[in-house]
Amino acid sequence: VLYANNLEFDNVPLGQMIHERTGLPVYVDNDANVAAWGEYCAGAGKGSSSMVMVTLGTGVGGGVVLNGKLLTGCNGAAAELGHFVIDMHGKECNCGMRGCFEQYGSVTALICQAREAMAAHKESKLWALAENEEANVNGKVILAAYDAGDETAVQVVNTYVHYLCVGVTSIINI
C-alpha cells in the first residue's frame, strides 16, 4: 500500500504480508478501482465502453474505466475523486488541501455535520436516537431522524445532498 490517508498507511507491503501468511496469490489495488472494474465487467457498467463509479464511505473514492481500460495513473491513484475542491475556503482535508469533496460528500462528513448540528440543537431527535451519545451517531441514526421529520436531521441531510450534487455534477462534467 503506497498511501492510504484514512488508514495512516504509507509504503506497507500488504500484499506480500498476506501472501506470506496465507501462501495464496494476492493482488492489492485501490478499493474503488477494484469496485469499478467489477461493475464494468459484471455489474452496472457491463456492456459500456466507459464508466465512472463513485464510492461513498469513510472518504469519497472513484474508479474510471475509459474505452475498456481502468485508469490507474502512475501510482494507482488516477481517480481520487474525493480530492477535488468544491469549496476553496472550506474545511481542511487530511490530504492537506481545503474544501475537498470528501470533506462534504463522504459518510464521515455526514456524521460530522450531524454531530455539529446536534451540539446546537439539543431538542433534535438525533439525541434520542443516538441514546444521548454523539459517538452513537451513524448514517442509520441520521436517516431515521430524517424520516421522522426532525428539522435538524432534515437540514443536515439536505446540505449533504447539496454537496453530493455539486461533487457528482463536477465529476460528470470532467
Short names for language-model regions:
Residues 1, 70-71:
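Hydrophobic "anchor" residues
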Residues 1-11, 27:
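Short beta-strand-loop/turn "lid" adjacent to the catalytic site in phosphate-handling enzymes
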Residues 34-36, 61:
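Short, active-site-adjacent cap segments at secondary-structure transitions
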Residues 66-67:
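A cytosolic small-molecule/anion-sensing beta-strand core signal
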Residues 77-80:
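Structural signature of FAD isoalloxazine-binding scaffolds in flavoprotein oxidoreductases
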Residues 27, 50-55, 61-63, 94:
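Short glycine-aspartate micro-motif
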Residues 15-24, 38-49, 70, 85-174:
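ATP-binding/phosphotransfer module of carbohydrate and carboxylate kinases, centering on a glycine-rich
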